[in-house]
Regions:
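A short beta-loop-alpha structural element at the N-terminal edge
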Residues: 5-19
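Active-site rim helix/loop that mediates acceptor-substrate recognition in acyltransferases
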Residues: 18-60, 66, 71
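Conserved beta-strand in the GNAT
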Residues: 60-62, 69-78, 85-90
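Active-site acidic-Proline motif in GNAT/NAT acetyltransferases
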Residues: 79, 92-94, 98, 126
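Conserved GNAT acetyl-CoA-binding A-motif
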Residues: 86-87, 112-126
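Conserved acetyl-CoA-binding loop-helix of GNAT-fold acetyltransferases
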Residues: 91, 97-110, 131-136
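Conserved catalytic-core motifs of GNAT/GCN5-like acyltransferases
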Residues: 118-123, 140-151
Length: 151
């Protein structure tokens, strides 16, 4: 298992986080027989870093593989007056199934616990990997929304 250290995302991490979002999201779609959703330069998702850092400064945790000197995962979170909302979480395909997402989720859960606030998230029930992770750590469906896309 990798030597993972959790820490706050710094400005110097934006490019690697963008590439991580690009790679992990595309890998998830391709593994399910769908085309990648990101195309073009791997730094395209840097927009997530810019927007979320402006909205909630300092509220992204990264999982760094200290031995490989690279990021294994990232998770944005959004403290609000009544709750902490879980944002975009990504794990690099090389680290799928190694507990990185669980570590990131535990970190954000501890943030919410320290603030004495509940956690909330919106997630697709069709994403069984995420649904399973969230269910294992105690999240339960509260409301169901029907979502459709145009083909």
């Amino acid at each position: 298992m990798a030597n993972i250290e959790l820490r706050a995302m710094g400005d110097e991490d934006w490019g690697e986080v963008a590439s991580l979002i690009y790679d992990s999201t595309n890998a998830w779609y391709v593994a399910r027989g769908r085309p990648p959703i990101f195309a073009g330069p791997k730094d395209g998702p840097i927009l997530f870093c810019a927007v979320y850092e402006q909205l909630d400064p300092g509220c992204c945790v990264v999982a760094e593989d200290r031995d490989a000197n690279r990021l294994a995962g990232s998770c944005f979170y959004h403290p609000r007056s009544t709750h902490v909302s879980l944002g975009i979480m990504n794990v690099h395909p090389d680290y799928f199934g190694q507990g990185v997402a669980s570590q990131l989720l535990r970190y954000v859960t501890e943030v919410a616990d320290r603030q004495r606030k509940p956690m909330r998230l919106v997630s697709s029930a069709l994403n069984l990997d995420s649904y399973s992770l969230y269910n294992r750590v105690g999240f339960v469906p509260r409301a169901i929304y029907h979502d459709m896309i145009q083909k």
